[in-house]
């Protein structure tokens, strides 16, 4: 077992005093060929920071295009894709070498990329050119550009790979693209400034956050029709779907709350105060815990889904935004967009009398300027031939 030595630190928060308990941590031993990295886009540094999650150290800083924003990992090959908004292209990173191996030109002002589960295609929403670039990831080339609505923000591919759902912020519509024919199947008038998208595991519905109208739209993907407009809090910016698909959590940035939607019935089950300006969320694989980054209060809220209540508020860096979990889910990774660092929170069972709880700060790692998105990739290095 490797060890990481930490100390006790006191952190003032508001009128109270919160503290993290640090002591000698045991880091897991891994097989020599095992790799696990976090990749972080640094929007104002034009770089990607690579964090080795075996040692929690900066492994490499990779120069990419101008203003990197969106990032995605390929589940079938050891590649990472970085959207460069300022240079209108996508950088392909070989995760085994942690080096850029290709740059793919797309259209104007791309912000987001999604990768099909079979690892064969990438979909990039180009907000400045009102289209979606379809990338053949084996050939590393754009095979088609599909015209959609005004200022598309996201293009999300369904789990079965058959449908791409696009939120068009500029005209309040949702486009459904048929992945086989690479053509728009339906255009759905929805709501004001649609943004984030979540698609159910059974491919039946998509939910879209309407940031301008404090609603979430429910879309039937078979008929291409709007099923419901659900009232939530002000400025819903992010949707977090439980892995089982039963509930959807909405981060209401300007209401300091989350709303929980029952996806089967299209009903809002309740809304709960969670922290100042909740930005993003992530749920554990067993559907038991929700973590929410509170951009305005420099905390991460821990919400127990079974109990239906917040059980902890963890102090992190300045303006926390993007979140990820390690492959084991023993570590929560928090991007602090203003302070330019990665906060690593360890989840473990307390085994000493004076340990305060199951969450503690493991370390904070400096990255680049304005880190905004993070993805984790784990793999076994292939045997040398």
State the predicted function of each range.
Residues 2-385:
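Predominantly soluble domains enriched in secretory-pathway, periplasmic, or organellar proteins
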């Amino acid at each position: 077992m490797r060890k990481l030595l930490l100390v006790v630190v006191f952190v003032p928060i508001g009128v109270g005093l919160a503290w993290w308990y640090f002591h000698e941590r045991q880091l897991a031993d891994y097989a020599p060929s095992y790799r696990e990295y976090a990749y972080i886009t640094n929007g104002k540094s034009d770089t990607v920071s690579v964090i080795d999650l075996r040692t929690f150290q900066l492994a490499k800083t990779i120069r990419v295009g101008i203003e990197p924003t969106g990032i995605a990992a390929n589940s079938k090959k050891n590649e990472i894709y970085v959207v460069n908004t300022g240079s209108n292209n996508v950088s392909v990173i070989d995760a085994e070498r942690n080096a850029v191996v290709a740059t793919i030109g797309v259209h104007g002002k791309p912000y987001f990329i999604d990768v099909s589960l079979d690892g064969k295609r990438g979909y990039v929403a180009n907000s400045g050119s009102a289209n979606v670039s379809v990338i053949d990831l084996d050939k590393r080339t754009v095979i088609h550009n599909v015209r959609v609505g005004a200022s598309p923000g996201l293009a999300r591919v369904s789990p079965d790979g058959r449908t791409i759902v696009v939120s068009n912020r500029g005209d309040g519509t949702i486009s459904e693209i048929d992945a086989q024919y690479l053509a728009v199947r339906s255009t759905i008038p929805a709501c004001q400034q649609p943004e984030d998208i979540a698609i159910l595991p059974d491919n039946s519905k998509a939910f879209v956050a309407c940031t301008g109208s404090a609603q979430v739209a429910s879309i039937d993907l078979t008929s291409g029709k709007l099923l419901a407009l659900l009232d939530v809090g002000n400025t819903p910016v992010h949707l977090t779907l439980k892995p089982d698909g039963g509930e959807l959590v909405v981060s209401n940035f300007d209401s300091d709350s989350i709303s929980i939607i029952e996806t089967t019935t299209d009903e809002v089950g309740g809304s709960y105060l969670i922290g100042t300006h909740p930005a993003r969320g992530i749920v554990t694989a067993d559907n038991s815990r929700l973590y929410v980054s509170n951009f305005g209060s420099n905390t991460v809220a821990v919400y127990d889904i079974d109990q239906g209540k917040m059980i902890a508020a963890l102090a992190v860096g300045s303006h926390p935004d993007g979140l990820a979990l390690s492959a084991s889910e023993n570590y929560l990774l928090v991007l602090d967009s203003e302070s330019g660092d990665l906060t690593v929170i360890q989840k473990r069972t307390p085994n000493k009398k004076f340990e305060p709880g199951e969450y503690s700060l493991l370390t904070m790692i400096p990255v680049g300027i304005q880190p905004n998105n993070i993805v984790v990739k784990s793999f076994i290095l292939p045997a040398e031939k």
